[in-house]
């Protein structure tokens, strides 16, 4: 027995030495790159068109987690960014969508809108933003709490893409105001705009880009990985009669700057990279003894992807150009922060479903659920059964009930939910329907229900939640326009399977094929930064990233 304990003691000693030797030295700077709407397959579908210093450099020299999945629904931008940076799912961090129906306000609210904040750099509503709906700490919050002198800078074209990654303690979160055509922030983060941001804004880059033409970077016939240019599945950009190259932005604007049009082009990615580089130099990121954190979210891929779909030449060209922006960013990081002095991760907030009409024409599973007619009929059925209008709203496949009226009339809420669930189950394209009771009290091992449950917050989500069959999208009504373009939000692989690559200091070259959940990113950063887990983190560290 004594010998046994001696052996254990020796083994424990070796283990302790091993762990001590593996203590990670934190990088000078962590760079989190989130690409808004990127399918995993783009890394390989467009690989032959990529340069050697962008995506390929990350893939060939970093740790590539090839089976990274979202483990909840809905797969939207707000929840995606929040889950990446909190390391937990919407049921904990509270961001259940880009918008949801607020029962108290009686209206739909944006996930980062804050009526108590005001814009810095703009007088428009676009400045009234903060992370006040975010109920959990981010890894960037944790870094600032542990090391108060560390800087966190976050930026995106979209407000939510900047605000949620930067968290509650960001030193600067900036997003693009499509009214003024400039980067702005809010009173939540700043009392006044930093001098360097004002200087950058004064250069009016978006106006200059709107005088240019978006044409393919390569010869049109080289885009063999995509559908023909003039595709029936693509939406029209304002000022254009066909969804085809070239896009003469000056002609399309017709004399008036259209900053929404600007964000629908690859130039918005270039503009964001310019801003990121300016922040590295002006905020002196990675230049002192404490680790800093730079959050960058490229929004243009999502805007272009919604309009044209994943098999469009527009999307392929955008990614070929984005590859060059990634290469430029890495070059600037190596120049200013130093090679092997920063750690970078690249992922996406969601992927995307192919245009359902494209799937139908290819004789593949897919289709549309047209909500308007179904909801009108459902309203009538509910009134007939219970004698009152009990449905307040539908948002993101959630049915919100008038709980006050139900309670006043002394109708069983469960009875109303079950009645509605049975009707919705008969709608074309509906796969599953769940009541709030089923989701709150769920103990079954049902992967679809579990994914919905992890995205469900009782006081924010609806009373009945439904999911569609693979390849289906919800639309308001049937029309030629509604069958063009695409979206995301489902529990299926085309929406949940995203890239995840780690690169830089402390990262070795390897491929990881086991399943990684998106919530594991923050759990891994905890050990790269040597900080406490953020308060609600449920993910697990990716050991392959941390091991040499």
Predicted features along the sequence, with ranges:
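A long, amphipathic alpha-helix that forms part
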Residues: 42, 262-288, 301-342, 418-419, ...
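Short, structured active-site-proximal loop/turn typified by the sulfatase FGly-forming signature C/S-X-P-X-R
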Residues: 43-92, 151-155
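Secreted, luminal/periplasmic, and some membrane-associated catalytic domains
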Residues: 50, 67, 76, 98-128, ...
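Bacterial Sec-dependent N-terminal signal peptides
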Residues: 1-26
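Non-catalytic, well-ordered alpha-helical segments in soluble enzyme domains
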Residues: 56, 136-145, 396-433, 514-540, ...
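His/Asp/Glu-rich, glycine-adjacent segments
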Residues: 89, 97-290, 299-306, 428, ...
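Substrate-binding rim/cap in mid-to-C-terminal beta-strand-loop elements of soluble/periplasmic
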Residues: 373-411, 485-529, 546-548
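Beta-strand elements within well-structured catalytic alpha/beta cores of enzymes
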Residues: 27-39, 58, 84, 143, ...
